[in-house]
Amino acid sequence: MALEDLFRNVTKRFNDDTTAEHEPMFKCPRCQQSVPESQFQEQGKVCPNCNYHARLTAAERLRITADKNSFVEYDAGMHSADPLHFPDYAQKIERSQTQTGMRDAVITGECTIKGSRTVLIIMDSHFMMASMGSVVGEKITRAFETATEKGLPVVAFTASGGARMQEGILSLMQMAKTSGAVARHSEAGLLYLTVMADPTTGGVTASF
């Protein structure tokens, strides 16, 4: 082996080792094993050692569910108000919007999944635990109504801590509203599939 080839191989091994040492690692909270962050992300945030599933953001779930560039969002500009002037509610909404880049805890829209047109509903627990307030209830109701009108199936990824207490009775009203929209969709003979993600609790479980 030529001397320059020897140095080239040594340099390559050094660079590979350096890259591995500096790559961000994910430590699984279940098995405590560390895996490269890139590998963890490529596998949909699933631990390759113990099959632990980390919580996904709405954007991450959309990326692995809908066909590429097929998603058209509904009601993108809708956002929560503070009708009861609940202490610190406006600040919590603003903080969640900054942290997640979302207007509220759910995104709805139309896409194709393996080529099939579908209305998609995705809740994001990173936004105030995806609690169901007026905006969440209204967007879900409108999504079902649009799907019923167009004769499309609905796929919903639920992940919610329940009703949003800062909106009081207005939050509880969303249970009846969404349930009614689901019932009308079912009466039309259309498909509705719920994927219950972590966490799915309380009024969301009872409503849709």
Model-based region annotation:
Residues M1-L193, P199:
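Terminal-region recognition feature
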Residues F208:
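C-terminal binding/interaction regions
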